[in-house]
């Protein structure tokens, strides 16, 4: 994590995994520091709230075992529900240690800082294809991370596209692939 700290003064590592420092106590610790970074970044415009409803089309390009891959997806808001009482399903058990860490961070920042990775059935790929059509010709925000993964992000604000994608995805189950602890903490924190 030290390399990520050095990479950029606004690296999200300062929020997600702020390091412990000598002399940390109840009033000044990794969670309160993360909250201060978040507050300052919002004030400075490093992080900004999008005022309009949107879907965020997200691509990752990476190599594995000598092959090139493109992972396509999108970010959206979902309704928080208890597992088994709605359409959101876990695939693994969670543990108290990681949940406590995420709870302390969420309480300090009053924000969910990272997305939950979910999968839903769409054998015809209808939702993603609508989004790919919506971003055709857009210049994405692009960044390459410390592992060499290239990230592309495009914002879709077209109400018709958002409505159509929502109609496809809303009735389907969502299986959490990564982020069980974050989901449970977000649900408990609402």
Residue positions per predicted region:
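A cross-family signal for N-terminal binding/gating loops and helix N-caps
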Residues: 1-187
């Amino acid at each position: 994590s030290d390399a990520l700290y050095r990479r950029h003064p606004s690296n999200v590592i300062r929020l997600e995994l702020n390091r412990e420092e000598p002399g940390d106590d109840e009033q000044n610790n990794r969670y309160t520091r993360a909250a201060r970074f978040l507050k300052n970044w919002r004030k400075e415009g490093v992080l900004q709230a999008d005022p309009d409803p949107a879907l965020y089309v997200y691509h990752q390009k990476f190599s594995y075992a000598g092959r090139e891959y493109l992972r396509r997806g999108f970010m959206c808001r979902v309704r928080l529900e208890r597992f088994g009482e709605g359409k959101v399903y876990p695939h693994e058990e969670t543990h108290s240690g990681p949940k406590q860490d995420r709870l302390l961070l969420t309480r300090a920042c009053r924000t969910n800082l990272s997305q939950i990775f979910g999968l839903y059935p769409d054998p015809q790929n209808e939702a993603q294809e609508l989004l790919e059509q919506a971003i055709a010709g857009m210049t994405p925000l692009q960044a390459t991370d410390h592992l060499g993964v290239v990230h592309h992000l495009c914002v879709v604000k077209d109400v018709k596209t958002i409505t159509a994608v929502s109609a496809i995805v809303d009735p389907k189950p969502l299986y959490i692939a990564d982020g069980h602890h974050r989901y449970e903490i977000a649900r408990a924190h609402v």
